[in-house]
Amino acid sequence: NPFVNIVIMALIIIGGIGFLTWEDIKNNKFHFRKYRMQSKVILSVTVILIVVPAVYFFFFEYFNLPLGERILTSLFQSVTPRTAGFNTTDLSKFSETGQMMTLLLMLTGGAPGSTAGGMKITTVAVLVSSALSVFLRKEKTHFFKRRISDETVKSAATIFLMYIALFIGGGMIISRIENIPLLSSLFETASAIGTVGLSLGVTTGVGIVSQLILIVLMLIGGSPGSTAG
């Protein structure tokens, strides 16, 4: 049902951009230049994280669907992995590239102060901007002509490394214990630490140790100290 899909996507986006961003929108309407730097980053990156995966899904995963359904399904699949975990297709039938794209979206999550999990949009944005600054030989990291403090960059790097270590470590252990493909187990651990809920269908058959690993990852991913504002 297109209407149901659109409503769910709208609610996911509304809940995933954060309360402070909505305060900016309420107070400043559509005057983007008046927004806080964080709101500008969140809204800009959110658009990118919706459009780029949707284009990939449209051309490479859903090419056998009618045009209208293809567009809607591609958009839905690019929106839902970062927070809600609703699913309208069998993810196990995705190509490995499609599964990896979904996995990265689950790890990224939504905005700070939102209902979304993951390492947060701002964490990823700070790290990408910092990497570009190093590549371009700039001394400081900037967003929208404002400097990002070194402390913020360090905090983002710490959270990123923690997420990657837990996600990969948990995935490797589960893959070894359960004798399943590494990508499949990494998908499950990304879903757990991102507090998303999507699955390739392997979680229902894993043993108690693997279940405990996933539970711990969910608890860590849902704790306030595991993300940066």
Identify what each model region corresponds to.
Residues 1-228:
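Membrane-proximal intracellular helices of multi-pass ion channels
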